């Protein structure tokens, strides 16, 4: 089995990126476990195949995954179908008010790949509700980033210890 944690992220305003970077910092607790943080636009099937577990980080736009993250899944879906079965994953969603639509969409894709969810989706709600607030750069509170860091650490520990 391949090893390592792959974190795939798309972010327009910085929230999902900050979440992914916090998770990567948490994953660094396992020094022997390779952790890669890739932009969704740069990640591909070979990156998925080379990893033993995944963390997907994206904003929710209009109750769905952001376009670039959806494009990542569209590009990779069939090339890795039936080749990732049973591998663990978790999700980080940055949302203005809800996040559950994107989380459900990601879970459906992961089910098709036969991935195994090892944590509930971690949704950070920014409260952005006006066009100006939605488009503005985001700076997340320390407690939200700490939750992301803890999830990254848990995934890395589970992978390194053979728990997942």
Q: In which residue ranges do the predicted regions lie?
A:
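N-terminal beta1-alpha1 ligand-phosphate binding loop
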Residues: 2-28
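A structural signal for isolated positions on well-ordered beta-strands in alpha/beta enzyme cores
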Residues: 4-6, 36, 90
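Short histidine/acidic/glycine/proline-rich micro-motifs that form metal-
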Residues: 13-14, 93-98, 141
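Hydrophobic residues within alpha-helices
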Residues: 19-27, 106, 151, 155
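Short helix-loop-beta junction
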Residues: 20-33, 111-116
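A short beta-strand-loop structural module common to alpha/beta enzyme folds
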Residues: 31-42
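Helix-loop-strand module that forms the ligand-binding subsite of alpha/beta enzymes
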Residues: 41-125
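Glycine-rich phosphate/pyrophosphate-binding loop and the adjoining helix
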Residues: 44, 118-164
């Amino acid at each position: 089995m391949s090893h390592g944690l792959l974190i795939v992220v798309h972010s327009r305003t910085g929230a999902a990126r900050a979440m992914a970077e916090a998770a990567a910092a948490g994953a660094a607790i396992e020094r022997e476990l390779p952790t890669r943080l890739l932009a969704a636009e740069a990640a591909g099937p070979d990156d998925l195949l080379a990893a033993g577990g995944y963390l997907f980080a994206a904003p929710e736009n209009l109750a769905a995954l952001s376009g670039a993250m959806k494009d990542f899944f569209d590009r990779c879906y069939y090339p890795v179908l039936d080749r990732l079965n049973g591998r663990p994953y978790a999700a980080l969603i940055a949302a203005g008010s809800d996040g559950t639509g994107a989380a459900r969409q990601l879970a459906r894709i992961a089910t098709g790949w036969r991935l195994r969810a090892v944590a509930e989706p971690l949704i950070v709600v920014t409260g952005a509700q006006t066009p100006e607030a939605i488009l503005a750069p985001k700076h997340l509170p320390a407690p939200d980033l700490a939750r992301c860091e803890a999830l990254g650490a848990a995934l890395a520990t589970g992978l390194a210890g053979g728990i997942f």
